[in-house]
Regions:
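Exposed extracellular interaction/assembly regions and N-terminal maturation sites
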Residues: 1-9, 16-103
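Extracellular interaction modules
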Residues: 18-24, 121-123, 134-136
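Short, surface-exposed terminal/edge motifs of secreted or surface/virion proteins that either
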Residues: 30-39, 99-108, 113, 126-146, ...
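Sequence/structural signature of small/polar-enriched beta-strand/turn repeats
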Residues: 45-47, 120, 144
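Tight coil/turn sites that cap or link beta-strands
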Residues: 86-88, 120-124
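Extracellular/luminal recognition modules and glycoprotein regions
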Residues: 118, 151-152
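Small-residue hinge/turn detector
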Residues: 154-158
């Protein structure tokens, strides 16, 4: 029996397999887990059409298996960035492209939901790839923030990233 791989490329070795090389493979897996949990990569996208984010089984360096992704390049039409159907993960994705066109993040197949940056939106989104259904998986944007809670007698951290409170608060 041979190794299997997760949707993000982590090798799942079978007992007794890879005699003499399991240490190297385990170290690669640990590096891959580190990349998945907090890595950063700049991913060039195609000017038009689709840009797939692929996994590289048993290797580091794949944009798909990186937590923070900055999309780069000049786009000359609306584009999509897609991921394989078996991926469940969350990402911080920045639209660092130039060109006034939309960027849509979606699964490669299926009819589930997706997340789209408008033609003028060059911001960062927190995106959850649910992988909840093999035919209609959802990709959703996680909205963080909102109006601050509390009163003017409490210290508040608001959605602009500033602290607020009453002038007489001591």
């Amino acid at each position: 029996m041979t190794s299997a791989y997760t949707g993000l490329g982590v090798e799942l070795m079978v007992t007794g397999e890879n005699s003499g090389t399991w240490g190297d493979k385990t170290n690669t897996n640990l590096n891959l887990l580190e990349q998945i949990s907090g890595g950063y990569i700049e991913q060039a996208v195609n000017g038009t059409g689709a840009t797939p984010l692929a996994v590289i089984d048993g290797n580091t360096g794949a944009a798909l298996a990186t937590r923070n992704i900055k999309l780069t390049g000049t786009i000359t039409g609306n584009i999509t960035v897609n991921i394989p159907i078996d991926v469940e993960n969350f990402y911080f994705i920045e639209n660092g492209t130039s060109g006034a066109y939309t960027v849509e993040f979606e699964y490669v197949t299926g009819s589930g939901s997706s997340v789209t940056w408008s033609a003028t939106d060059k911001g960062t989104k927190i995106i959850l790839a649910k992988g909840n259904d093999v035919t209609n998986p959802d990709i959703v944007e996680s909205v963080v923030g909102g109006l601050p809670g509390g009163s003017n007698t409490q210290v508040q951290f608001n959605n602009s990233g500033a602290f607020g409170g009453d002038a007489d608060l001591i």
